[in-house]
Design a protein with these regions (language model features):
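PRPP-associated nucleotide enzymes
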Residues: 2-4, 8, 12-205
Length: 205
């Protein structure tokens, strides 16, 4: 009976992993076609969340199974074959990509959240965003000293939230290998905030 249950669990895990099998789209005559489809799917929303801001809305990518899969594969292609202990995602859209990447790699996922959203003892770092000021936090036991970490988020703008995340990772003793973003707004020069961390982005505006 126990063996049967274990067999069922293994079968269930196998079926679940199939849903994250490499997308044929991701391996097409390289990603130029894929990237263009992703670029077209990202929707500009003017004056959100404040007047004068053009918000990059990724929900059309998330709602399309092929495009969502392709976007995850972009991150995975940067991570496979490397020694990575944890994937860190930034509240909130970084969770959507980071947790899927961590699952596929078989490593832990660490959420960095806005202050007041985590229940246990935290480290805190402040940041400036193009539309305000805020603080981010991470559980003090989320990353062990010496662990190799990749930061994943949907968008790099001014670099404030990402820089705060990098501070938290390093406070914990983690080694930040790379910061990866689906979208980068190059005119805001956010990657300067992350120096000397290598920055990778797939869709540049």
């Amino acid at each position: 009976m126990h063996a049967s249950r274990a067999s069922q669990r293994r079968s269930c895990r196998s079926e679940l992993r199939l849903t994250f099998a490499p997308s044929p789209l991701a391996f097409a005559p390289m990603a130029l076609d894929t990237l263009e489809k992703l670029r077209v799917a990202v929707r500009d929303v003017p004056d959100f969340p404040k007047k004068g801001i053009v918000f990059k809305d990724i929900t059309p990518v998330l709602s399309d199974p092929v495009l969502f899969h392709a976007s995850i594969d972009l991150f995975l292609d940067r991570c496979r074959g490397r020694k990575i202990d944890k994937i860190v995602g930034i509240d909130a859209r970084g969770f959507l990509f980071g947790s899927a990447v961590a699952y596929e790699l078989g490593v832990g996922f660490v959420p960095i959240r806005k202050r007041g959203k985590l229940p246990f003892q935290t480290e805190i770092a402040s940041y400036s965003l193009e539309y305000g000021e805020a603080e981010m936090e991470m559980h003090i036991d989320a990353i062990d000293a010496g662990e190799q970490v990749v930061l994943v988020d949907d968008l790099l703008a001014t670099g404030g939230t990402s820089a705060a995340a990098a501070v938290l990772i390093r406070k914990a003793g983690g080694q930040l290998l790379e910061a990866q973003f689906l979208i980068e707004l190059e005119f805001l020069h956010g990657r300067k905030q992350l120096e000397p961390t290598p920055v990778i982005s797939f869709l540049k505006y």
